[in-house]
Each structure stands twice: as structure tokens, then as C-alpha cells.
Amino acid sequence: MTVKLTIDCMGGDHGPSVTVPAAVKFVRAHPDAHLMLVGIESAIRAQLKKLKALDDPALSIVPATEVVAMDDPVEVALRKKKDSSMRVALNHVKDGEAQACISAGNTGALMAVSRYVLKTLPGIERPAIAFSLPNPTGYTMMLDLGANVDCEPQHLLQFAEMGHALVAALEGKDRPTIGLLNIGEEVIKGNETIKRAGELLRASTLNFRGNVEGNDIYKGTVDVIVCDGFVGNVALKTSEGLAQMLSDIIREEFGRSLLSKLMALLALPVLMRFKKRVDHRQYNGAALLGLKSLVIKSHGSADAYAFEWAIKRGYDAVKNGVLERLTRAMADNSVSLGDGEHDAGGAGPASPAAGHHAEPSAAQSSKA
């Protein structure tokens, strides 16, 4: 089976200078992949020519005349730039010409346009960015990592349901454990949104283990950690900054003297393994969960190596049938949760807003 993906080549801080080289390298390593490069045709062709890949049959150019800038308001991306590389790439997924879209573009715009073009799964009001973060024994699924800066309690419950379904589908766990990210484990901690979300989670049939703190993220305390997009994005980027700082400190210390340089040579295999484990670029690419099609969000600042990993996330998701498995697990979970009988003022599948697909407002999204 050929895996067909659309690439928003104009998205991110660096545009085609990063996205096109990453795409070329990816198809050369994955002969069953076909990438549709969406964007300003002349800019894409210039990069392909430089890479001697103009005639590569695994790559095709899909012209788009507009670009969603990283600082564009959601309304501009959604209502004015209807021929943007982001919109065209998503339209090809909607029309069945590709199985997933990968973009490093403006997060808020990507969330809003994806939601409008592709629609959400039944019972889901807002998509959430989800990713598996490493822990000592495996991975912890965390969401939301930046799609929704302001959330209501029922949105956090829905994120938990999606995280539960994804872990159940991919890892075969019947009862994945759920934690709510907070400033303390006690139920009295947190703002009113967090407290109310905790009440909804405790009242649900999910395997909710209570509040978790920031230092639990990489411990493997629970299978799924739920938070709003503001908190999740700050936590993620803080982690990346810390990993980079540790790498820089080790490099600096081993370069201080001739003796330390000799020690570095002896320790080189260990140092290389350490560098690989803490290199956040290999963790680039997070799924926008809750949509009827697959969308992978890359960091806007990603280099070609990191963006290639984002493409791989989309490729692997298609190969592993993630969307189909998630949809089935969500349907099964909806039945187990009582088909929306949460006492949440509209939380869960019975929410009057669930499944509503009017154009989202800027207040619901972030641009980070």
C-alpha cells in the first residue's frame, strides 16, 4: 500500500528550505510513500532542483497561492486565505487524495482550519495536540500540548477520553490510567476549571488516578496526562529547553581541558547514546486528536531532521491504522461512559456543542 501524505511546505519558521529537504530525504528512505508538496510552486521547485529531485516520482507538487504566516490571526487563515498551502493540503486529505497532512504552521490556524475542513469526531468539541513523552519504562501520552489555550472542564474530560482511547488502541491496555496536571495532588488545589474537571473525571468510568504534578510527567506515574494547551505547551518547551541545556553543559565540561577531552573520547559511546535520548528533534510531530482525518503538527522552529520525524509520525500513523483504531476505541468508550450521561453541564458526547462545526473563533486557539 502506498502511503500518501500532504506536506504544508510553506508552514513553519523556515518554509520550503526545511520542509522540502525533509520530504526528499524521507521518500528516499521509504519507497512506499508518496508526498504531495503543497505551496508556492516556484519556491518548491527551487528546492527540488537544488536537491536534484525534480523528477522524483514519489514527490508531486500541488500549487497554492497563499501562505498562513506564523503570526496570522485565526480569522485570516480561516476566512481570507482559502488558497493557503495549509488549507489546500487539508482539502486533499478531506477529498481522500491523501491519508494525512503534516504541517509546521501556526498552531491556532492549523487547529481552526483542520476543525473546519475535516470536522471532529462525534462527541468531541475541540481537537487536542497529543504526543507520547518518554519515561523510564515506556511512554506517557500527554494532551493538550498547545491547540487550546483556554478550556472548559468538559474539554479536559474529552481530552481524557481521547487519550484513554488512543492508549487503549495502540498499547492494548483495557484501563489506561489518567492523571490531571495540577499544582498539587490534593483535590483542593488548582483553579476552578481544574477542580471541576477533577470532579467530572472522578464521576466518569475512566481509570482516573487524581492530580499529578509537573515532576510526574517523565516518571511514568500514569499512562495519560491531561492539561489545557497553555500549560501543556509551556511544559513541553520547558522540557526541550532543559534537555538542550544539559547537552550544552556536558559538551562544555568535557571541553574544558585536555584531560577532560581525553575522558570524553573514552565516554563517547555513552555520550552519543545520551545525546540521542535527549535530542528533542526526534520527538517532533504530534497528532491533532479528535478529527475525522489525520493531521500531524510539527514544531514551527523545526529543522529538516526534526521535520522528517514529523513526516514519519504521519506515515507510521497511517501504516498502523491509528485513526481507525482510535475511532473504534472512542465509540467503545462512549458506550462504557454511558453515552454522554456526565453531569457536566453539557460535558461528554451529549454536549449540545459537540459535533458543531461552525468556524472556530480565535479565542479557542493558540498561535504558538
Swiss-Prot record:
Keywords on record: Cytoplasm, Lipid biosynthesis, Lipid metabolism, Phospholipid biosynthesis, Phospholipid metabolism, Transferase
Q: Does the keyword Kinase apply?
A: no
Ranges of Low complexity compositional bias? 349-368
Q: Where is the signal peptide?
A: none
Q: Name one GO biological process term.
A: fatty acid biosynthetic process
Localization per record: Cytoplasm
What pathway is it annotated to?
Answer: Lipid metabolism; phospholipid metabolism
Question: GO cellular component annotations, sorted alphabetically?
Answer: cytoplasm
**Enzyme Commission no:** 2.3.1.274
Q: Which domain of life is it from?
A: Bacteria
Kindly give the Gene3D superfamilies that the UniProt entry links to this protein.
Isopropylmalate Dehydrogenase
Q: Is Cytoplasm among this UniProt entry's keywords? A: yes
Task: Quote the Pfam families the UniProt record gives.
Answer: FA_synthesis
Which stretches does the entry tag as region Disordered? 335-368
A GO MF annotation of the entry reads: phosphate:acyl-[acyl carrier protein] acyltransferase activity
| Reaction(s) catalysed (UniProt annotation) | a fatty acyl-[ACP] + phosphate = an acyl phosphate + holo-[ACP]
Subunit and partners: Homodimer. Probably interacts with PlsY.
Family, per entry: Belongs to the PlsX family.
Instruction: Describe the task this protein carries out.
Output: Catalyzes the reversible formation of acyl-phosphate (acyl-PO(4)) from acyl-[acyl-carrier-protein] (acyl-ACP). This enzyme utilizes acyl-ACP as fatty acyl donor, but not acyl-CoA.
Please state what the protein is called.
Answer: Phosphate acyltransferase
Q: Organism source for this protein?
A: Burkholderia multivorans (strain ATCC 17616 / 249)
Primary gene name:
plsX
